[in-house]
Amino acid sequence: MRVAITGAAGQLGRQLVAAFEADGHEVRGFSHDDLDITKPAALFDWDSDVVVNSAAWTDVDGCARDPERAMRINGEAAGAVSAVAAACNALIVQISTNEVFDGTLDRPYHEDDDPDPINAYGRSKLAGEIAVVAANSRHLIVRTAWLFGPGGTNFVTKILAAATHAANAGQPLRLVSDEIGNPTWTPDLAAAIVSLVTQDDRRSVVHVAGVPAVSRLGWAQVALEAADIRVDVDPVALATFERASTPPMRAVLAPSAGVAEMDWRPASVECARGLPAKPNA
């Protein structure tokens, strides 16, 4: 297949390019410099069978401060990319988020649960889902959560840096104990998307996220133990952090049936130790 990937220079986009190429597909990756997704006509130059839209504005606090820009990029532009894919008779794969849910259920969210976002980022991503579906009957919405990947900065590397600073200063490390989610290793997510795209019995909406669900505190503790960093930890409530955007407290995704289990813990350990973690087998 010929596969076009937007956001190809991003944390997930790089892994998508690698995963589709490893599976033998012809891939064209479009970075932000290559393609403004609010004006996606350049996609017509690449006659694709599949378009994966991983481009997004994921700065949740930025989205809260400028919801119109969030809606333009995450909502309207997603629909425009989907329309170009439809004109090329291509499948559109839209990457979405657990933040389309409000996080109030006492169980994980399934694909058929009603979205009800509580922040500007979630609202813009839900608008993107709706626009993608309206523009292209051949669509696959992939909801995921708490992405972290090799190279660059991610939750694990940020926690290790913060813990080292706190330990050197003789201060406790404050960690949120009541926000629960699914850490998701981007190589695992990319491999799952390749598998989903090549299936004959594709669904229209799937949840692809790491297991088991965990708090930010619990995730951090796995990384700290792996890196052998000793620091006093001060568990705090999400509400004590002043932020422009309020994340849902428990927007845990139930991975869809048939999606390979993706345990986030081995990758977190390897990432914390500075080793090249690989996708789950």
Roles of regions detected by a PLM:
Residues 229-231, 246-281:
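C-terminal amphipathic/interface module of NAD(P)-dependent oxidoreductases
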Residues 1-21:
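N-terminal Rossmann NAD(P)H-binding glycine-rich loop of SDR-like oxidoreductase domains
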Residues 6, 30, 54-55, 92-98, ...:
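SDR active-site strand-loop-helix element
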Residues 171, 192, 199-243, 272-281:
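Mid/C-terminal beta-alpha module of Rossmann-like enzyme folds, strongest
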